[in-house]
């Protein structure tokens, strides 16, 4: 009898448990049904009351992403496709989007309201979360206030809405995001050596510290914290343009049947005795200062048209605004039929095509740089580039000197110093209203021996320099392809060079001269197998970017610059 009663009580307990289970499943089903999601256009109607979150859902709307929960978080997203902030526009209003962005700023009003300024690429937008929003809770806002820091990276699902007032602190001013879910993807240290807002202010802008004193973030401080400095829209724009220039250079050459080569940067011999030396398996080697020898070797090998984009190394000790010890060189070499101007014309057209595409396709980046630099002037060029001979340049400088009562260039020198280059750039801008021009036919006295002399005047060379805003960004020349003439020119150069340095005739110099003679002999020998007429050019990428954008220092155009005092980062 007792066993029968126990059986009945057990059955009652099982029935109660089963009933509770059914009720719980029903409640869960009801909660799920309240989320009316339209998969087609990513819209959602959420009917829950505020703070009525069930344990099954609360932890899925906010939190930190880790290796254990990220699969579950991905699974529970109702927006499946990622968007960029730059993709958001009026046509997206009312739709839910999934975005990963960096937090630039946080403005919180207790646990009831919070504004996040988010940025991604070259765009930014405001996101808002309020406890009055039926999708949110105080707990979610508390998580943001207690956990999210500036420069952290977050993933959000949010609905795009029109903002009631323009948001001046963001790139997108007329739209904002109302957050539905938020997950911390990567947390930044709360103590930052430099703030994004300070880094984003113009270099001439005087920032105020807590004591009211003005200060400007020095370039060295920026370079010491390069990963923070590079995050600014200004720097991102610079390197997007730098990337575009190198890609356009490559694309245009490939279209014109050039072959890209990759020459060694560790070499056995160096013409310049001041090249960087290194121990190469107990043998002295050098870092390459130029790819010219290998480009000419390719021409001798009948490649006809070659180019290379790569690093070169110089041991310049000067701490100037335009010199680096490692930089990227845009180089090409090509044969021609009758005159080296065929190569110069090709280069000129190449540069003009790059300028045109930058002007058209990178208007936003140029505008950002313009706003940052304050004194930025739009780059100007002509489809008919002004070309000047060296003697014409000197005469124009003398005329300018006389008009300005300035005697800095009253004599005809065989080179242009930095002051003369800048002044001539201003003369060209005033007379021709362009920033880009070419100077050719320099005197042979201070130029390399391998450049072909002018057939009408051996004291002049078939050589040219490219200028932007008074800065020399590159140079090129017709090379001597006749080994006998090359040998003769070298002997004359060698004699003159020794006469100019006759006070340094010690044993070490004699050894260096012997090594240089061996290097030159190896260079001359490749032309004994026959070589086509050819010319080439080298352009410093960082120098080009600096001059084109009007940057005051070449280090701003280098991702991580190397100069005599900097080996990091």
Curated annotation (Swiss-Prot):
InterPro entries given in the database record: Aa-tRNA-synt_II, aa-tRNA-synth_II, aa-tRNA-synth_II/BPL/LPL, Asp-tRNA_synthase_2, Asp/Asn-tRNA-synth_IIb, NA-bd_OB-fold
Residues that hold ATP according to the record: 314-316, 322-324, 540-543
Enzyme type, top EC level: ligase
Region (Aspartate): 292-295
Reactions this protein catalyses: tRNA(Asp) + L-aspartate + ATP = L-aspartyl-tRNA(Asp) + AMP + diphosphate
Location(s), subcellular: Cytoplasm
Superkingdom of source: Eukaryota
The EC number(s) this enzyme carries: 6.1.1.12
Keyword Ribosomal protein: no
Key words of the record: Aminoacyl-tRNA synthetase, ATP-binding, Cytoplasm, Ligase, Nucleotide-binding, Protein biosynthesis
SUPFAM superfamilies named among the record's database cross-references: Class II aaRS and biotin synthetases (SSF55681), Nucleic acid-binding proteins (SSF50249)
Chain segments carrying region Disordered: 1-23
GO CC list: aminoacyl-tRNA synthetase multienzyme complex; cytoplasm; cytosol
Chief location bin: cytoplasm
Keyword field contains ATP-binding: yes
Gene Ontology molecular function: aspartate-tRNA ligase activity; ATP binding; RNA binding
Protein family (similarity comment): Belongs to the class-II aminoacyl-tRNA synthetase family. Type 2 subfamily.
Full protein name: Aspartate--tRNA ligase, cytoplasmic 2
Protein species of origin: Dictyostelium discoideum
Gene: aspS2
């Amino acid at each position: 009898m007792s066993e029968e009663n126990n059986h009945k009580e057990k059955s009652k307990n099982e029935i109660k448990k089963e009933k509770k289970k059914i009720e719980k499943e029903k409640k869960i089903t009801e909660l799920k049904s309240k989320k009316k999601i339209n998969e087609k256009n990513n819209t959602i109607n959420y009917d829950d009351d505020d703070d009525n979150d069930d344990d099954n859902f609360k932890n899925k709307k906010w939190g930190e992403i880790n290796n254990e929960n990220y699969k579950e978080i991905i699974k529970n997203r109702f927006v499946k496709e990622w968007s960029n902030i730059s993709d958001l526009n009026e046509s997206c209003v009312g739709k839910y989007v999934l975005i990963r962005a960096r937090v630039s700023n946080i403005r919180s009003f207790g646990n009831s309201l919070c504004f996040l300024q988010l940025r991604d690429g070259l765009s930014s937008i405001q996101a808002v979360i309020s406890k009055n929003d039926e999708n949110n809770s105080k707990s979610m806002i508390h998580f943001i206030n207690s956990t999210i820091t500036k420069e952290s990276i977050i993933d959000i699902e949010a609905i795009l809405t029109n903002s009631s007032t323009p948001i001046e602190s963001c790139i997108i001013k007329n739209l904002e995001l109302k957050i539905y879910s938020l997950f911390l993807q990567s947390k930044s240290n709360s103590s930052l050596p430099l703030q994004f807002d300070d880094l984003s202010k113009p270099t001439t802008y005087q920032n105020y510290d807590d004591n009211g004193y003005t200060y400007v973030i020095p370039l060295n401080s920026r370079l010491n914290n390069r990963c923070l400095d590079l995050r600014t829209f200004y720097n991102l724009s610079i390197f997007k343009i730098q990337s575009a220039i190198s890609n356009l250079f490559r694309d245009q050459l490939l279209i014109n049947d050039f072959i890209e080569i990759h020459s060694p940067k560790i070499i056995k011999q160096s013409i310049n005795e001041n090249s960087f030396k290194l121990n190469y398996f107990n043998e002295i080697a050098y870092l390459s200062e130029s790819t010219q020898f290998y480009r000419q070797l390719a021409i001798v090998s009948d490649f006809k048209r070659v180019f290379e984009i790569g690093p070169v190394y110089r041991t310049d000790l000067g701490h100037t605004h335009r010199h680096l010890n490692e930089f990227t060189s845009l180089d090409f070499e090509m044969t021609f039929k009758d005159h080296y101007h065929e190569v110069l014309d090709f280069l000129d057209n190449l540069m003009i095509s790059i300028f045109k595409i930058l002007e058209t396709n990178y208007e936003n980046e140029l505008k950002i740089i313009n706003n940052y630099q304050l004194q930025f002037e739009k780059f100007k060029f002509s489809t008919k580039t002004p070309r000047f001979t060296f003697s014409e340049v000197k005469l124009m400088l003398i005329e300018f000197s006389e008009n300005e009562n300035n005697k800095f260039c009253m004599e005809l020198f065989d080179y242009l110093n930095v002051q003369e280059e800048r002044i001539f750039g201003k003369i060209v801008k005033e007379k021709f209203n362009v920033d880009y021009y070419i100077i050719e036919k320099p005197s042979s006295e201070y130029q390399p021996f391998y450049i072909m002399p002018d057939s009408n005047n051996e004291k002049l060379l078939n050589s040219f320099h490219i200028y932007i805003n008074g800065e020399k960004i590159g140079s090129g020349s017709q090379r001597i392809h006749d080994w006998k003439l090359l040998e003769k020119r070298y002997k004359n150069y060698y004699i003159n060079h020794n006469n100019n340095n006759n006070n340094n005739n010690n044993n070490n110099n004699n050894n260096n001269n012997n090594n240089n003679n061996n290097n030159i002999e190896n260079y001359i020998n490749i032309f004994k197998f026959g070589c086509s007429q050819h010319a080439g050019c080298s352009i410093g990428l960082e120098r080009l970017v600096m001059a084109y954008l009007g940057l005051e220092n070449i280090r701003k155009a280098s991702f991580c610059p190397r100069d005599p005092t900097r080996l990091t980062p």
